[in-house]
Curated annotation (Swiss-Prot):
<dbReference type="GO" id="GO:0015937">
    <property type="term" value="P:coenzyme A biosynthetic process"/>
</dbReference>
<feature type="binding site">
    <location>
        <begin position="14"/>
        <end position="19"/>
    </location>
    <ligand>
        <name>ATP</name>
    </ligand>
</feature>
<keyword id="KW-0963">Cytoplasm</keyword>
<comment type="pathway">
    <text>Cofactor biosynthesis; coenzyme A biosynthesis; CoA from (R)-pantothenate: step 5/5.</text>
</comment>
<dbReference type="GO" id="GO:0005737">
    <property type="term" value="C:cytoplasm"/>
</dbReference>
<keyword id="KW-0173">Coenzyme A biosynthesis</keyword>
<comment type="similarity">
    <text>Belongs to the CoaE family.</text>
</comment>
<keyword id="KW-0067">ATP-binding</keyword>
<feature type="domain" description="DPCK">
    <location>
        <begin position="6"/>
        <end position="202"/>
    </location>
</feature>
<dbReference type="InterPro" id="IPR001977">
    <property type="entry name" value="Depp_CoAkinase"/>
</dbReference>
<dbReference type="GO" id="GO:0004140">
    <property type="term" value="F:dephospho-CoA kinase activity"/>
</dbReference>
<keyword id="KW-0547">Nucleotide-binding</keyword>
<keyword id="KW-0808">Transferase</keyword>
<dbReference type="GO" id="GO:0005524">
    <property type="term" value="F:ATP binding"/>
</dbReference>
<comment type="function">
    <text>Catalyzes the phosphorylation of the 3'-hydroxyl group of dephosphocoenzyme A to form coenzyme A.</text>
</comment>
<dbReference type="Pfam" id="PF01121">
    <property type="entry name" value="CoaE"/>
</dbReference>
<protein>
    <recommendedName>
        <fullName>Dephospho-CoA kinase</fullName>
        <ecNumber>2.7.1.24</ecNumber>
    </recommendedName>
</protein>
Amino acid sequence: MLDLLKVSITGDLSSGKTEACRVFQDLGAYVISADKVSHSFLVPHSHIGHRVIDLLGSDVVVDNAFDRKVIAEKVFDNLVLLQALEAILHPEVCRIIEEQYCLVAKENKYPLFIAEVPLLYEIQYANKFDRVILITADENTRRERFTRKTNCSDLNFYQRCARFSSNEEKMMHADIIIENNGTKEELRHKVEEYFYALKGAL
């Protein structure tokens, strides 16, 4: 049995998941991001890349790379297409996270393994983790963060949010809930408390 506590951070769009992960990493945890993992293996000439092109069309490739803006425009107002894309990507993302956990645990260098997985519950992946941390923020706060960061419209925010299950449902299952309607410094203090509590959990 591997003795490294395996923790997932999840939450709605622009709730502050990535910022919380950054704090955990600053404190010494190993952090992996599902979004970054998918970006790393999604290349046009790979097996998965060919499947994505077959699904979405060759126009998603620009200058020999996937154009993520074009992909987003195709899938975020088409739930069937979005779910088909996720069915291609998510199994590989989960496989890589599991593989990385085994490698990191054997190194025995880190106090915690943290995986940022936005759709943790939606893809039925929560049972693979020892603890789940849910980052929450109210809708107006999240919308303002999203539009400020991306320059996208409110409509785009709501289209992307449609893929997430309700926050109330996730709150019923999460082990730890961190409210993030305040400043980054306030979030840091909360994350620090849980870091030290989790560090001593095994």
